[in-house]
């Protein structure tokens, strides 16, 4: 499918934090993907709304409303990655985080966009107590992402 537009929503993973620095700015996977798409598809447009450190509720509340006016059906690709910053918090509430994530997916699906959803690395290889807790949390979170991805195609 040829996309007319790519909208990137989320946190540091999508913003490009800690990726290649170009002219003093991060240039992450979303920027590089958009560059290739723009080179191959005429009249292609791109916007990256992602901001490092954002929680899933902030992405749903702040970024999705900004992106909605730019969605023009299935020809708009929207990447949605949020929730990892919630998962690593001491007072993580899996039910709330997953429900909010699902709300974001539902809003974007109703808008008619083609969605790209992403899982988080579950096992970093670290053997600390915190790493074990995060692995368990991310496994549950990722299972929800996989279910939602399957449900929206």
Model-derived features: positions:
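A short linear-motif detector with a strong N-terminal bias
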Residues: 25-28, 57-58, 136
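Alpha-helical cap/lid subdomain in secreted, periplasmic
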Residues: 41, 62-153
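Generic signal for short, ordered secondary-structure residues
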Residues: 46, 57, 127-128
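Structural motif
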Residues: 54-64
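Serine-esterase "nucleophile elbow" of acetyl-processing enzymes
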Residues: 1-52, 65-74
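Active-site neighborhood of divalent metal-dependent phosphoester/pyrophosphate hydrolases
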Residues: 51-56, 85-86
